[in-house]
Amino acid sequence: MNLEVKKIDTANARLSAKPSIEDLEKRYDKIAQKIAQKVKIDGFRRGKVPLSLVKTRYQAQIEQDAQEEMIQEVLKNALKELGVETKDLIGSPNFTKFEKKDTHFEIEADIGLKPTIVLDKIQECVPSVGVEVPNEEKVNERLKQLAKDYAKFVDTDSQRKAQNDDKLTIDFEGFIDNAPFEGGKAENFSLILGSKQMLEDFEKALLGMQASEEKEFPLTFPSGYHAEHLAGKEALFKVKLRQIQVREALEINDELAKIVLANEENATLELLKERVKGQLFLENKARLYNEELKEKLIENLDEKILFDLPKTIIEQEMDLLFRNALYSMQAEEVKSLQDSQEKAKEKRESFRNDATKSVKITFVIDALAKEEKIGVHDNEVFQTLYYEAMMTGQNPENLIEQYRKNNMLAAVKMAMIEDRVLAYLLDKNLPKEQQEILEKMRPNAQKTQVG
């Protein structure tokens, strides 16, 4: 076999090979024998089909399998010549030429190799971090909210008029064009007035009502209402208010702490204040990281961590970004790209910078995760998707299966690993006193979240 291999840089190589037709044909018998052991042809026992018949009936498959074997051997020899192990091959080779001549094939391909990444400048990439530590006023605000959230609802004076934050029990039925509609009726339905559990105009109409009072009022469903058969429709609602309950105020003291920190043996108000302060600090930290510092850190990693990137992976990422962009394009723009190969190439090329950055950051994050032993368990991926499903009203099992079918679980895991790696680097750059706050919160993270 005539083989030439050239290493372009530490992450890219190019091969040129001219395997003979004779080399290909030598593989036919062996492949045909494998097929003969599996196929069943009328008139012959399994495994007893003549090779000549197998070669005739399965000629296309034999040719394809032989070519794949030949390509794998070319690739194996190329890696050997480069002194590279198979595990260091990144992605699939990009075959730029594959032509069958009279006596041989002409094959040319670009090969992506695992890049060499030096992480000695990582600390230079991490921006200075200073998270706002919540003051006493912020802590007291959260304590008041906790006292409200944990308060029980109790019956009240029958003459009370419904106010925001009251718990109402109602019967209601809605009509469109004098006819009841699906989902428009309920009995003994509970809601917190002002919570936006129902449409705002519906809740406003209940303000000022008293127990046992009945009321009719018109309501127009928003044009973007989630139930399409109701969107933009005018309805008439009949409502009966059965009961009004109000929150029984809780004092901010040790008793509140025992309710909120139910898993703690000796919960006190001071401990609750400490936990609230820590929780508020974590919220401030997450907001600062997500809205500002993580993106700044990514930009610094992209700018300062320099290494060769496998071009085959960049091209694959460009294809992915281009395909994803097609889904959000107007039909006219998609047709314009379909009608003009030049425009399609230009549009695809516009994703090169984003693709290069994405590939680079993925390699850096992967290297950092391995160095710092940061990972994500499969169960954590499923928990994240389960939470997403619950928040969007989807069936968790269906959502997970959808991600699995579309081979997206690995992407979710990688995104979670990236988030942890970036947070880890930023946490290390926190002032000492703020790192101490983090350390105090970690043992309690799984116990109780306050607020």
Swiss-Prot record:
GO MF terms held by the record: peptidyl-prolyl cis-trans isomerase activity; protein folding chaperone; ribosome binding
InterPro entries, per the entry: PPIase_dom_sf, PPIase_FKBP_dom, Trig_fac, Trigger_fac_C, Trigger_fac_C_sf, Trigger_fac_ribosome-bd_bac, Trigger_fac_ribosome-bd_sf, Trigger_fact/SurA_dom_sf
Sequence similarity: Belongs to the FKBP-type PPIase family. Tig subfamily.
Name of the protein described by the UniProt record: Trigger factor
UniProt signal peptide: none
Localization (cell): Cytoplasm
Keyword Isomerase tagged: yes
GO cellular component entries: cytoplasm
Comment, domains: Consists of 3 domains; the N-terminus binds the ribosome, the middle domain has PPIase activity, while the C-terminus has intrinsic chaperone activity on its own.
Annotated catalysed reactions: [protein]-peptidylproline (omega=180) = [protein]-peptidylproline (omega=0)
Main location: cytoplasm
Domain PPIase FKBP-type: from-to ranges: 165-250
Gene Ontology biological-process entries: 'de novo' cotranslational protein folding; cell division; chaperone-mediated protein folding; protein transport; protein unfolding
NCBIfam families reported in the protein's UniProt record: tig
Gene: tig
Top-level lineage group: Bacteria
Function, in words: Involved in protein export. Acts as a chaperone by maintaining the newly synthesized protein in an open conformation. Functions as a peptidyl-prolyl cis-trans isomerase.
The enzyme's E.C. designation: 5.2.1.8
